[in-house]
A protein has these predicted regions:
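Short, low-order "capping/linker" segments at domain edges
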Residues: 71-83
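Basic, often amphipathic N-terminal segments
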Residues: 1-61, 66-69, 84-139, 152-161
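Short, exposed beta-strand-loop hairpins at the edges of beta-sheets
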Residues: 140-146
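Residue-level signal for glycine
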Residues: 148-150
Length: 161
């Protein structure tokens, strides 16, 4: 079983890149889940199709908040622009794909109707309130069991509309 995360980085990111500490600034599209390794190739293909269907993704910074089990992780909530609830709809579609491939969601209480699109602050940076950006990529990231390093397993380019 692989421990995976789906994000959209605000900073350039490449397949194969390894992060020993934290990830760069990113939107968490799906928090950690486990997936049987034998499902991975088909899973990656289906995620790619979903990402293409929801592309492009445009966001704007909203209010600050704190997430995590102790409410001590500073985040910037975000709003999807353009087609409305695009990030929430993409999140729901990816959840269906995760479930179809026997995925196990680490914190189901933060999923589906409880999903709050956000950017976790990295070195004091996220988006400013009302700041707009287009997301350029969606990434599949694996947390390695022994070291807890995170490796970028796949990167999907988003349409630039």
């Amino acid at each position: 079983m692989s421990e995976l995360l789906i994000t959209s980085s605000l900073d350039p990111i490449e397949k194969g890149q390894v992060f020993s500490k934290g990830l760069p600034r990113h939107v968490t599209i799906w928090q950690y889940f486990q997936l049987p390794d034998f499902h991975r190739d088909v899973f990656i293909a289906e995620v790619g199709e979903a990402v293409e269907a929801f592309s492009p993704l445009e966001i704007m910074g909203a209010e600050c908040d704190h997430f995590g089990p102790n409410n001590d992780v500073p985040v910037r909530r975000i709003m999807a622009l353009g087609s409305g609830a695009t990030l929430i709809a993409l999140h729901a579609t990816l959840g269906e794909i995760i479930n179809r491939h026997d995925g196990v969601i680490a914190n189901p209480e933060w999923a589906y109707q409880n999903y709050n699109p956000h950017i976790t602050y990295v070195e004091g940076q996220a988006l400013e309130e009302a700041e707009y950006t287009k997301l350029r990529t969606v990434e599949l990231i694996e947390r390695l069991p022994a070291s807890k390093d995170k490796i970028v397993r796949n990167v999907w380019e988003l349409e630039d509309a």
